[in-house]
Structures are given as structure tokens and as C-alpha cells.
Amino acid sequence: MRLMISGGGTGGHIYPALALIDALKAHDPEAQVQFVGTHRGLESRIVPERGIDFKTIKIQGFKRSLSLQNVKTVYLFLKSVVTARKYIKAFKPDVVVGTGGYVSGAVVFAASQMHIPTVIHEQNSVVGVTNKFLSRFVDKIAISFESARSQFPAQKVVMTGNPRAQQVANIKKSGALAQFDLDPDIPTALIFGGSRGAARINAAAVAAIPELNKRDYQTLFVTGQVHYEKIRNGLSATALAPNVKIEPYIKNMPAILPEVAVILGRAGATSIAEITALGIPSILVPSPYVTNDHQTKNAQSLVNAGAAELIKEADLTGTSLVAALDGLLQSTTHRETMAANAKKLGMPDAADQLLHVLETVIK
């Protein structure tokens, strides 16, 4: 198979694409892949590091108000479609896949106009603007949440789950918590606001430290690089008991997930895919700063299934954080029930499912 894939801007668009590429290579080591992204997005660093053929397109998103910038955006979009057509003619893909982000709009649209099979993957429960636009042109639409189905043409939709789930589903316990001087036999809570950290989650966690120090469970608090120094400088040398550890960033987060009893964090699509694939109980604090409040919708899908609890960011304090963790970590039965419900929602073969969709559209 010759696969052209496009997505970018955030990890939520990039990691599903990389998971699909891994699955394709596992099935067909001779497969050829080209990734089209932007020169400024996260993909410009991550994708070439994997040894994947990488091309760039210059594009920007629409402003939500009337703006001269939107005139420039239309011009850049049309120009980027021309560039995408050149890449497509040179690479000759069997199928073109978009995983979200403005750049995928130009690439997938160009492919559809050239009568090349096209598929888009929507990671969230609320459909992104690019995928909404592309839905009328593509052959198939893969979704990760059932709640996204009604937002697309019904005959095109296939439920596959998020390919990222397959990458983490088979990870086993490896004693990874030992590197943080944590005991693998004691239940551990992970507090994590995403790769950049989340100020409100961090503030609540800092306020909770005096109580967390007293608990018989462990806490691993990951602040995000930009917040770490300020938080550490604000704590005295004796502020942390041995059962509470603070880290700026964890390079290989999937490796520690099987050893975590509870996660408190955001409700991004990648996080949801990981915690359901592994069946980890979670306390979700959706970001209120994302488009169409899609993280709340993502979280609600788990809450409705008894697989997670939800705390609005405005309601998150040190006290509410400790109460939520206590409720799960001091009740093995409650935790096991939630873990089982989370596991039921997981799709550990999501990348293979999406790969099958690609095979069906290739004429």
C-alpha cells in the first residue's frame, strides 16, 4: 500500500496518524508512507524523528470573526491545494487519510478532486471544523465516539476507535514507577494536565499536597515543563512526604500507565483512548478552553458508562481533588468496577480497524 497521511498542529491529530502507520508497517513492511504537515506544527519534529517521509504545506486556520486574515486564509488554502496536488502526483498514493488539523483539509480535498480514495479520522465526540468540511468529499469517515456519528453523513461512518489505543493496549507492567522511587505494590494516583501542564490542575494539586502526604496511597504529580520550576521553588525541602513525587515531564508516559491505579487529568482524545484501552479509572477535568467544549463531551461518554468521574475546572480545588482521589483509592471495589467499565469502552485493535477501512476504499 502507498499511504499519504495528513494531520497536524497538536498531538491529538498526530499520534493517531503515527499509530496507523505502525499498524500498516506491521501488516506490510514494504508499504510506502508520506506524511504531509506544516513546518511550524508539532509534526515537523515528531514525524521526521520516526524516519517517515515528510512534506510541508503553509496554511492557517479561519478566524471566527470577520477578518482580513480570512482573505489570506482562503488564498493560502487554495495555494496549499495546488501544492498538495503536486505531492499527490509525485507520490501516487493508493489512499489519502486525514487525521485533523487545517493542513489535512487541503491534502484530503485535493485527493478527492483527483478521484483518489480518501478517509478521515475524527478523534473527538464533537466534530472538528476541518473534518466537517471534508465529510462531503471523502469516501469513508472513521470515528472514535458514537456521539460523533450523527454529525456526519450516516452512510460513510465507521466506528474504529482511536488508533492510539492499539499502541498502548498491550503494554505490561515493567516496574517503571521505581524510577520515581515509588513502590509498585502501593496504589498510585497520576495527576497530569497534559504535555504542557494545566495551571488549574497544578494549583489544586499543590494545595492538596499537605493532605496527600498523609495518605496510604502514592501520588505522581506531573506539572509540565513550563510550570515545574515555579512549583518546586514554591515548596520547601520538607514539603513532600516520600509517597508524593513531582516531575516536570515523563518522556515515555505509556510505560507507566499500566502501573497507575487512578488518573486525574484532561479529557483529550488521546488520553481517553489510552485510559480505556488499559482500563484505568479516571477523574476527568475537561479543559474549558477547547473548541465547542469537546473535552466535556468526551468525558461525559465515560461518565455515562460508569468509567470515569468528572470535575469541572471551576470546581477543582485542593479539597475536591483529595476527596475524588480518596473516593477511588480507598475503595478497591469502586475502583475495580470503574476499571472494568473503562475497559469495555476500549478498542485495543483500533489501528487495525482503521487499516481495514482503508483497504475497503482502495479500488
Swiss-Prot record:
GO terms for cellular component: plasma membrane. It is a peripheral membrane protein. Keywords: Cell cycle, Cell division, Cell membrane, Cell shape, Cell wall biogenesis/degradation, Glycosyltransferase, Membrane, Peptidoglycan synthesis, Transferase. GO terms for biological process: carbohydrate metabolic process; cell division; cell wall organization; lipid glycosylation; peptidoglycan biosynthetic process; regulation of cell shape. One of its GO terms (molecular function) is undecaprenyldiphospho-muramoylpentapeptide beta-N-acetylglucosaminyltransferase activity. UDP-N-acetyl-alpha-D-glucosamine binds at T10, G11, G12, N124, S195, I250, Q295. CDD domains: GT28_MurG. It is found in: Cell membrane. The keyword Transferase applies. It catalyses: Mur2Ac(oyl-L-Ala-gamma-D-Glu-L-Lys-D-Ala-D-Ala)-di-trans,octa-cis-undecaprenyl diphosphate + UDP-N-acetyl-alpha-D-glucosamine = beta-D-GlcNAc-(1->4)-Mur2Ac(oyl-L-Ala-gamma-D-Glu-L-Lys-D-Ala-D-Ala)-di-trans,octa-cis-undecaprenyl diphosphate + UDP + H(+). It comes from the Bacteria. Its EC number is 2.4.1.227. It is an enzyme of class 2 (transferase). Pathway: Cell wall biogenesis; peptidoglycan biosynthesis. HAMAP family: MurG (MF_00033). Belongs to the glycosyltransferase 28 family. MurG subfamily. Cell wall formation. Catalyzes the transfer of a GlcNAc subunit on undecaprenyl-pyrophosphoryl-MurNAc-pentapeptide (lipid intermediate I) to form undecaprenyl-pyrophosphoryl-MurNAc-(pentapeptide)GlcNAc (lipid intermediate II). This is UDP-N-acetylglucosamine--N-acetylmuramyl-(pentapeptide) pyrophosphoryl-undecaprenol N-acetylglucosamine transferase. The gene is murG.
